[in-house]
Amino acid sequence: MADRVIEELDEDESLRLISAGGIGRIAYQSRFGPAVLPVNYKWYDGAVVFRTARHSALDEDLQTGIAGGDYLVAFEIDDYDTAGRQGWSVMIQGPAHHIESEEARERAKQAGVEPWAPGDRELFLRIVPHRVTGRRIKPA
């Protein structure tokens, strides 16, 4: 008999779990193939908001993909208790966009996302969810 169960989370519960912000992973098609990078994020104004450096590998890959259309990415956030063998994960899928206008950047700064990575990280990006899914593993 299994001692764990997996529960599918609805969108509201998934968004509640990620609303505090933290560290998530952006998955996208880079010029070298599929890539997954951890970034500090905040949930703000109905979107995942994060920062990166101009001309970084992430910026260059996304600039190429974003130009002229929606560049679809996945963003994954999770929290686990390895000793208790339980936790949850949420995946957001949708287009990534640079936050271009000064007004929009000022609003995004209000989200308070602070990258751990050193250096100038003044390029703001957002992912607007088209699909939100989540799962929780817990004791049976």
PLM features: residue spans?
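Short beta-strand segments
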Residues: 21-54
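Compact nucleic-acid interaction/catalytic patches
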Residues: 44-65, 73
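Short acidic/glycine-rich loop or secondary-structure boundary segments that cap or lie
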Residues: 36, 49-51, 58-60, 84-85, ...
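Extreme N-terminal tail/first-helix region
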Residues: 1-19
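Short connector loops at helix/strand junctions that flank enzyme active sites
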Residues: 19-21, 36, 43-45, 67-72, ...
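Charged, gly/pro-rich active-site loop segments
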Residues: 2-3, 73-140
